[in-house]
């Protein structure tokens, strides 16, 4: 741990967990989608659900999806910017079993039809933990390069001998 971990990240406030961490969750989720986000269904759990709106968690998540970082002064305007860019988004609450109190589930759709579901938690000091990708348990912070292999099953049928 270094001095900057103790002091917390440079950020637009008010909270390193509810704002800076939420921006990072949105940012990493958008990167995992590998497409321009056009639709986001965001489910908030625990303290994200109960106090997140007052702490700007909602705006921070959208800001991250727009590619902003925690110190971006445009975070408070993220709803306006997202709507201007054509992004549809909605928020609701969810109760998750055995999840960190600052957890969000992001169901994202990209402009080319790509979809992803990310479950992530803000664990303090602006740090995050990605807990699930498309329902599969994972465990990474995105603080260091991470290789993610997405196994896609392709069905290929060859013509039967009678068809030739």
PLM-predicted stretches and their roles:
Residues 45-73, 78-80:
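A structural-propensity feature for long, helix-poor, extended segments
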Residues 156-164:
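Single conserved hydrophobic/aromatic residue that forms the stacking wall/gate
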Residues 10-25:
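Conserved phosphate/anionic-ligand binding catalytic regions in large, soluble enzymes, centered on
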Residues 32-41, 69, 101:
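Non-transmembrane, aqueous-exposed alpha-helical and coiled segments at domain scale
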Residues 1-10, 40-43:
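Short, hydrophobic/aliphatic alpha-helical segments
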Residues 139-151:
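Short glycine-/aliphatic-rich beta-strand segments at the starts of folded cytosolic domains
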Residues 66-112:
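Contiguous domain-boundary segments centered on the initiation and propagation of an alpha-helix
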């Amino acid at each position: 741990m270094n001095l900057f971990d103790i002091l917390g990240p440079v950020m637009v406030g008010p909270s390193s967990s509810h704002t800076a961490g939420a921006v990072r969750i949105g940012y990493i989720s958008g990167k995992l989608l590998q497409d321009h986000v056009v639709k986001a269904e965001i489910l908030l759990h625990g303290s994200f659900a109960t106090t997140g709106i007052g702490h700007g968690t909602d705006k921070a998540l959208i800001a991250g999806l727009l590619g902003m970082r925690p110190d971006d002064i445009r975070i408070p305007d993220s709803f306006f910017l997202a709507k201007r860019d054509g992004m549809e988004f909605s928020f609701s609450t969810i109760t998750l079993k055995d999840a960190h109190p600052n957890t969000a589930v992001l169901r994202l759709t990209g402009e080319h039809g790509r979809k992803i579901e990310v479950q992530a938690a803000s664990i303090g000091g602006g740090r995050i933990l990605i807990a699930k990708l498309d329902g599969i348990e994972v465990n990474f912070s995105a603080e260091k390069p991470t290789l993610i292999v997405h196994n896609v099953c392709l069905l290929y049928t060859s013509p039967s001998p009678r068809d030739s």
